[in-house]
């Protein structure tokens, strides 16, 4: 589904590279390495005149080519660094032809710094308009961090959506819920109005014949889901090891079983569904089922390998040989996933892990008990990562309409004494962001959050019994809790064309938006196409980030209800810990 986006990005990048003729060096911003790897291979770069890629930092490679390309984001720091390089070239009397490729677009700050440094005329600045990175066949990401400012996040989201429409046509319909969904719709309309004014009333682009609509999912309506521990395979992997641009870093011995120790450099392993059928099959299953599932795959592969003994005729042997490469690749993938699963299982044996899951379930179930505070004390005494502790506090604050002052004071003291006094700043940052709140009413021991109570009474968020092996309900993703964001979004899809349900949708918390692109398009285009007959294709856009469990929940609905075919775009992939880390101060900067 994202193939067109990748092909377009690849063509544009190679065109920019080829505009610099001959051999050239590529200096790459380190944080963009995963993104570049999603678009082109090292071999492709070599075919286009780049024999080697260097990291873009203060050190200039000794064997740099006479023509140099910088690939970076248009930040103040990068502009200063480019200027430092150019001045060094001048001091060394090197005639280096420098080209800067920024993504997705340049900006006034970047170019102003280059001008003030006196190097703007010494280089060429071009743009690689990669607004969203294709991470998988059904997933695009803007790769924005959780700390991205509101205005910038909304503008980048709007730009990415419009760029997607340039390839696939304008969405006939925009639906969603929440303040950021409403603001993004306003930005979309404003952009197209400005375009119409410039083009004398004409707006570029035809109505999409591929997509039914875009569904805006506002993270601010569901802060709960990211703070829970993800229990799907990919979700748990992201929690424990971290997934970057659909790659996970592993010890060399895990990738290559011939290496005896873990002392070698870490290696990347692709989690893209296109890289392995096994990966696609297991990415969304509940982690409790990963062992039996991998055993089942191992037995099947073993049976397939036995086919070589049964191959007797030339045709049978030829058929087996044609499959051998694929079988060996899947066998390697199975070994790596088995090693990953073993690593994750070891984490579940930590003395705080089960208490953490129990505490989270108590909070989302609205259990009126002080048990959760006793459990949190035990988790702190077990010296669980500080991010986990703050996740629980934020979860408690959201689900119980704020924390009592004495509880905030108690945990501020416990956390600073256990993890460091600089976390006083973390506390304040979370309070300023509204993730930790002081309860206004103190006469109820554990007052329920009005908004969360509304959602809890509206949707079956919590399930006491869930079939994790053969799931029928999205609550399998958290072993008893179904992501609120998915319930809200899917309710809109099912109810927006039902007159009886529209009033209910309009009266629920969070601004409800549902707008047709053009009045005359209230009848869907007759040539609307999907990969599966009878299904309506929808782009689900997560404003503020999404988790792998939410993707798994949508995919389950896609499979079970057979009504929609989803493509996902998100401002970034998040976990509760990555959200918390955005509020933790940098110790090094504090010591300067």
UniProtKB/Swiss-Prot annotation:
Keywords: Protein transport, Transport. Pfam families: Sec1. InterPro entries: Sec-1-like_dom1 (IPR043154), Sec-1-like_dom3a (IPR043127), Sec1-like (IPR001619), Sec1-like_dom2 (IPR027482), Sec1-like_sf (IPR036045), VPS33_dom3b (IPR043155). SUPFAM superfamilies: Sec1/munc18-like (SM) proteins. GO terms for biological process: intracellular protein transport; vacuole fusion, non-autophagic; vesicle-mediated transport. GO terms for molecular function: ATP binding. The keyword Transit peptide does not apply. GO terms for cellular component: CORVET complex; fungal-type vacuole; vacuolar HOPS complex. Belongs to the STXBP/unc-18/SEC1 family. Essential for vacuolar biogenesis, maturation and function. Involved in the sorting of vacuolar proteins from the Golgi apparatus and their targeting to the vacuole. This is Vacuolar protein sorting-associated protein 33. It comes from Schizosaccharomyces pombe (strain 972 / ATCC 24843) (Fission yeast).
